[in-house]
Amino acid sequence: MIKSSWRKIAMLAAAVPLLLASGALWASTDAIHQKLTDLEKRSGGRLGVALINTADNSQILYRGDERFAMCSTSKVMAAAAVLKQSESNKEVVNKRLEINAADLVVWSPITEKHLQSGMTLAELSAATLQYSDNTAMNLIIGYLGGPEKVTAFARSIGDATFRLDRTEPTLNTAIPGDERDTSTPLAMAESLRKLTLGDALGEQQRAQLVTWLKGNTTGGQSIRAGLPESWVVGDKTGAGDYGTTNDIAVIWPEDHAPLVLVTYFTQPQQDAKNRKEVLAAAAKIVTEGL
């Protein structure tokens, strides 16, 4: 059964599917559930949504505990792992890595310009988060010691769901039922909150991650498109086979505590086109009553 609920994080997961977590709902939970259901049916795919309202720790979930291919949204965890190392060694982010022609993979708009000069880990992190540069992601993974080290970092911050198994671009195959390189909307939302608003990173490192996310250049048609223009958004998009279209975001509405929103979407046809408008619509549905 699809879960679509407001609830306190501390409440038992077995609570009723549509549960009032605080004194009042932003909008009717029945209406939110129905709108997300209708959106999913119209889209012809499978939609996953997790929203955390940090004002009262309430949540709204739609397939929140189902696995989805993360695609490039996993880059947040990799960059955060680098930042974590810089807490004990500030020079880590200044370490320069060589970039060879053999390293380049599809969609590397930044790294392909630095074959002679190389790039620092800070520059690679910015490139992979703000331009979704795939070679930058692979170089970061290589520096960390492989995909399993990114997963180990996720475990260290309390995420038992995240798993990174491959590198770019194969981590984007998004084969239905394949658990490689997947997480759930709720697990990713909780981790994103810890990394950007919590204490999983030191203050300086947390601020740097937020700055990178706010400077993302690829999310204008996804979550951001479903929100008021005055709201500040830091996000990371992702895309893969089976029309997989993802976006994870930290949102700062006007006169309200931050929100954390994860939207994952995938389709049954391997060659299906990306559907960023579905993510924008989902973002509007879950925030329009705020």
Curated annotation (Swiss-Prot):
Q: Which family does it belong to?
A: Belongs to the class-A beta-lactamase family.
User: Could you list the residue ranges forming a coiled coil in this record?
Assistant: none
* Native organism: Klebsiella oxytoca
What does the UniProt keyword field contain?
Antibiotic resistance, Hydrolase, Signal
Q: Name one GO biological process term.
A: beta-lactam antibiotic catabolic process
Q: Which Gene3D superfamilies match?
A: DD-peptidase/beta-lactamase superfamily
What is the additional note?
A: In strain KH11 OXY-2 is known as OXY-2a.
Cited function: Hydrolyzes broad-spectrum beta-lactam antibiotics. Active against all third-generation cephalosporins but ceftazidime.
Give the top-rank taxon of the lineage listed in the UniProt record for this protein: Bacteria
**What EC number(s) does the entry state?**
3.5.2.6
The active site lies at S72 (acyl-ester intermediate)
Q: Which reaction does it catalyse?
A: a beta-lactam + H2O = a substituted beta-amino acid
Q: Which residues bind substrate?
A: K236, T237, G238
Q: Please give one Pfam family short name.
A: Beta-lactamase2
> What is the annotated signal peptide range for this record?
1-27
Q: Which GO terms describe its molecular function?
A: beta-lactamase activity
Protein name, as recorded: Beta-lactamase OXY-2
Mutating A225V: effect?
A: In strain: D488
Give the stretches traversing the membrane. none
